[in-house]
Amino acid sequence: MKTLLLTLVVVTIVCLDLAYTRKCYKTHPYKSEPCAPGENLCYTKTWCDFRCSQLGKAVELGCAATCPTTKPYEEVTCCSTDDCNRFPNWERPRPRPRGLLSSIMDHP
């Protein structure tokens, strides 16, 4: 009887995933997905590229074992709870007016 009980316990442990897997938002496509084993941090990386003035900052979301290092023009935030790296909610830059009126507005 003890052998049967021990066998059931071992089978249960093998079949169940007892290790917790962090879930983070990832880009391309933007959705929440489980992270790979050992990756327990979510990160949000933002930077300006050539489209920054029209579309706003570029954004990369993902999982990491350690918080990614940044380049001088990048900003990175890391967090350690499920889905804590939502897409940043900021206003897109407004296009500047063009034409004669814009030159008047530029010099009040």
Curated annotation (Swiss-Prot):
<keyword id="KW-0732">Signal</keyword>
<feature type="disulfide bond">
    <location>
        <begin position="67"/>
        <end position="78"/>
    </location>
</feature>
<feature type="disulfide bond">
    <location>
        <begin position="35"/>
        <end position="63"/>
    </location>
</feature>
<dbReference type="InterPro" id="IPR054131">
    <property type="entry name" value="Toxin_cobra-type"/>
</dbReference>
<dbReference type="Pfam" id="PF21947">
    <property type="entry name" value="Toxin_cobra-type"/>
</dbReference>
<dbReference type="GO" id="GO:0030550">
    <property type="term" value="F:acetylcholine receptor inhibitor activity"/>
</dbReference>
<dbReference type="InterPro" id="IPR003571">
    <property type="entry name" value="Snake_3FTx"/>
</dbReference>
<dbReference type="GO" id="GO:0005576">
    <property type="term" value="C:extracellular region"/>
</dbReference>
<keyword id="KW-0964">Secreted</keyword>
<dbReference type="InterPro" id="IPR018354">
    <property type="entry name" value="Snake_toxin_con_site"/>
</dbReference>
<keyword id="KW-0528">Neurotoxin</keyword>
<feature type="disulfide bond">
    <location>
        <begin position="24"/>
        <end position="42"/>
    </location>
</feature>
<dbReference type="InterPro" id="IPR045860">
    <property type="entry name" value="Snake_toxin-like_sf"/>
</dbReference>
<keyword id="KW-0800">Toxin</keyword>
<keyword id="KW-1015">Disulfide bond</keyword>
<keyword id="KW-0872">Ion channel impairing toxin</keyword>
<protein>
    <recommendedName>
        <fullName>Long neurotoxin 43</fullName>
    </recommendedName>
</protein>
<keyword id="KW-0629">Postsynaptic neurotoxin</keyword>
<comment type="similarity">
    <text>Belongs to the three-finger toxin family. Long-chain subfamily. Type II alpha-neurotoxin sub-subfamily.</text>
</comment>
<dbReference type="GO" id="GO:0090729">
    <property type="term" value="F:toxin activity"/>
</dbReference>
<feature type="signal peptide">
    <location>
        <begin position="1"/>
        <end position="21"/>
    </location>
</feature>
<dbReference type="GO" id="GO:0099106">
    <property type="term" value="F:ion channel regulator activity"/>
</dbReference>
<feature type="disulfide bond">
    <location>
        <begin position="79"/>
        <end position="84"/>
    </location>
</feature>
<keyword id="KW-0008">Acetylcholine receptor inhibiting toxin</keyword>
<feature type="disulfide bond">
    <location>
        <begin position="48"/>
        <end position="52"/>
    </location>
</feature>
<comment type="function">
    <text>Binds with high affinity to muscular (alpha-1/CHRNA1) and neuronal (alpha-7/CHRNA7) nicotinic acetylcholine receptor (nAChR) and inhibits acetylcholine from binding to the receptor, thereby impairing neuromuscular and neuronal transmission.</text>
</comment>
